[in-house]
Amino acid sequence: MGKVYIVGAGPGDPDLLTIKALKAIEKADVILYDRLVNKEILQYAKEQADLIYCGKLPDFHTMKQETINRFLVKYAQKGKMVVRLKGGDPFVFGRGGEEAECLSENGIPFEIIPGITSGIAAAAYAGIPVTHRDAGSNVAFVTGHYKKEEDFEEKWKALATGIDTLVIYMGIKNVQQIERKLLENGRDGSTPAAFIHWGTTDKQKSVFCTVDTLSETVIKENITNPSLIVIGNVVNYHYKLEWFESELKKQDLSEAL
């Protein structure tokens, strides 16, 4: 019997990969990886490893979750060391829990290797601390995508005014609903907000607005996935603490000279 390692690849910058994740990738016989995994990380796999792309776009899956689960079980039963490589952290909106359940039910040994989630890392690369003693004593990590419409409606009632900082994953498609539900349930429309596109990578772009202009900003700035939404007064710290995109601009300028 082999073993499956459910591994977080981090938010995009390959240098944010953990040492334990790197060791697992180097030893793996089979690696099943998602779309948001930086392909540079795959260079650490051994030459004879099987690399299987499971890429998932919003509303379109190259490989269905049930198929991925079957592959994990099949390769482990063949005695392989399997790495299931997922962007960010596998247990933060990454279906890692579902995959671990499947392995447990089938008697497959497994291990979880956490990764740095984009909700913290992308915000940090945009100069936004998700908590701050003067602006945010609590934070909620939220998915903007729900299996059931009624779940979407109900959750936002609690989130609108009870949480200082909202970090929203997969929220672009439903941004109009998010804006509407926050405003309907008492969130101040002037609350600062940020979109962080391709956070921690050389394609990172941060766009700033307010809660009452979320949906129009998506259209105006042509914001697409993968993008993180951060809402709360902590967003204003960007103007003091921004560092990464300034470095990218300096690099672009030096290369142009």
Swiss-Prot record:
Reaction equations catalysed: uroporphyrinogen III + 2 S-adenosyl-L-methionine = precorrin-2 + 2 S-adenosyl-L-homocysteine + H(+)
Alphabetically ordered keywords of this record: Cobalamin biosynthesis, Methyltransferase, Porphyrin biosynthesis, S-adenosyl-L-methionine, Transferase
Family: Belongs to the precorrin methyltransferase family.
Described function: It is a step in the biosynthesis of both cobalamin (vitamin B12) and siroheme.
E.C. number(s) listed in UniProt: 2.1.1.107
InterPro entries assigned to the protein according to its UniProt record, in alphabetical order: 4pyrrol_Mease, 4pyrrol_Methylase_sf, 4pyrrole_Mease_sub1, 4pyrrole_Mease_sub2, CobA/CysG_C, Siro_Cobalamin_biosynth, Uropor_MeTrfase_CS
Protein name: Uroporphyrinogen-III C-methyltransferase
